[in-house]
């Protein structure tokens, strides 16, 4: 039995050649097309097991072709390829019935595995759901890293669902952006999206915030107040930092999820709601469950679908596009011309470890827009903590092969061999400078903390900064 019949349509001849060669090597038939209209003509006499289509082509684009195919050949799996990989492209493809979404440049082995899955799917005659067009919007989510592409895929696959989702990720990775995207690209898109941060509300107010209260329920309750559940009725409720929710509120939340109704604080009449829960946390909820700080049954109720957001250090290839976007966004907000990053500045930013992730990068871009005098952002314009980290990294790279004392010994031997004197006076300032820069980088520029780590007083550190020519402090 033939392994499969694969069609490829792409106006890029090199893409057609690479795919055709790889597919035929796997023992599958492959037919390549330059134009979408040629595919439609060929479908009148023959039907493949799977079609790979580029999204941007002359005459007819991939999404238009996909729409026609889903109307006339609903069981034919279509894989959408695009070099313009973003959330909207992925969601549009899934919503219109694509089998999967393949960002360029793609890995050939992964592509072949995807083709085989599509062929299996086709031969099992699994009828896909008809796609529904929903509200389209521009997203602030940016990223071409593989980890972000997987996030796009999940959002796309959930675009016809109202299932609960748990978003995991470090602080600043964009959990609320993902929650907004899940809502915008769902059947609830036109209904309210309500967000509540558990960590930002005093514990004694959380119950009233979530469920509302009746008049006279407690001192100061002068009128009936709707809680976030009622405000989100028909839409989505985003519970940020769910790991900080008190146990008694967890019990009430579990009951609402199970029964679809609740009682306001001080109330006796049940309030029915239809709400999709999207929860997020930077914590390890499984660990919280094991420690008795989070209900296991609630964890399983929320953890139906989990989205893991990558930290910025795992998607450094996205830093240039993110930085450009944030610089443009800030310039537009302030009504000024957009600044550009010098090549070395961008290199330094890509090598920096962004502990605050995307949020920290955005704040730095805001700072640069305001504080940089010239139109081009030079390395010396970067915040001191980034410049110090860069200098520290360079120093570490010089010492990777041997212990620092060995390098010092080699330097001393060379200096003495050259007849130099007073070498201690030459070495000590450099030694102090290295330790001082490391301490300042570690404390993010806090002089008092750096002085304590070095065993100095604050005045000594200030004097050393001046002696060693370390500025900006």
From Swiss-Prot:
Gene3D superfamilies: 1.10.8.60, 3.40.50.2300, Homeodomain-like, P-loop containing nucleotide triphosphate hydrolases. The lineage of its organism: Bacteria, Pseudomonadati, Pseudomonadota, Gammaproteobacteria, Enterobacterales. One of its GO terms (cellular component) is cytoplasm. Member of the two-component regulatory system NtrB/NtrC, which controls expression of the nitrogen-regulated (ntr) genes in response to nitrogen limitation. Phosphorylated NtrC binds directly to DNA and stimulates the formation of open promoter-sigma54-RNA polymerase complexes. Phosphorylated and dephosphorylated by NtrB. GO terms for biological process: nitrogen fixation; regulation of DNA-templated transcription; regulation of nitrogen utilization. GO terms for molecular function: ATP binding; ATP hydrolysis activity; phosphorelay response regulator activity; sequence-specific DNA binding. It is found in: Cytoplasm. Disulfide bonds: none annotated. Residues 141-370 form the Sigma-54 factor interaction domain. Residues 447-466 bind DNA. Pfam families: HTH_8, Response_reg, Sigma54_activat. Keywords: Activator, ATP-binding, Cytoplasm, DNA-binding, Nitrogen fixation, Nucleotide-binding, Phosphoprotein, Repressor, Transcription, Transcription regulation, Two-component regulatory system. Residues 5-119 form the Response regulatory domain. ATP binds at residues 169-176, 232-241. The modification 4-aspartylphosphate is found at residue 54. This is DNA-binding transcriptional regulator NtrC. It comes from the Bacteria.
